[in-house]
């Protein structure tokens, strides 16, 4: 299948490629390439608007020299792996100010650029939105089924048991089916092992409060 045939199929055009005369093929091919790129950019803007990513951040913008204990190789290995297709999870653990949210947001942006619906939200905002929703079950279902979910700042506030149960319900529904990224300042109970996640510890001292264990037991 040549470029013209591929683009006609991608854009759901009904005209067969063999019915396009040779002198018209080049300008039509140029137009189809432009249309394909326009649709791709439009999709990215739409996914970004729906994702909750407030400011676009990339891994290239991250200051890897700020803390040399953060493994750039580990992060890039994860990003370049089929983590979305294979539902690989990721837990970023470390103290406040080490860049966990930046890295998580950048990984979410990579998913958006690849055309995947993504939700990036703090744990506090997630449970708040569920509480305020007209149909909480429907909102839980959305976060359980969105292609890529990032729960930021898990453990920065103490949740009620019902909130913890809600977070656990979402994570357990996604486990081994859809990829989940979690950032937290808590290191207790090996949470990455509880839901089959890659663990990257961004060190400068981490809290050892027990709250997070409730989510992964």
Regions found by a protein language model. Give the residues of each.
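N-terminal pre-Walker A segment at the start of P-loop NTPase domains
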Residues: 57-82
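Interdomain "pre-motor" coupling segment immediately N-terminal to P-loop NTPase/helicase cores
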Residues: 5-55
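Conserved hydrophobic/aromatic pocket- or pore-lining residues that grip, position, or stack substrates
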Residues: 62, 104, 122
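Walker A/P-loop nucleotide-binding motif
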Residues: 86-103
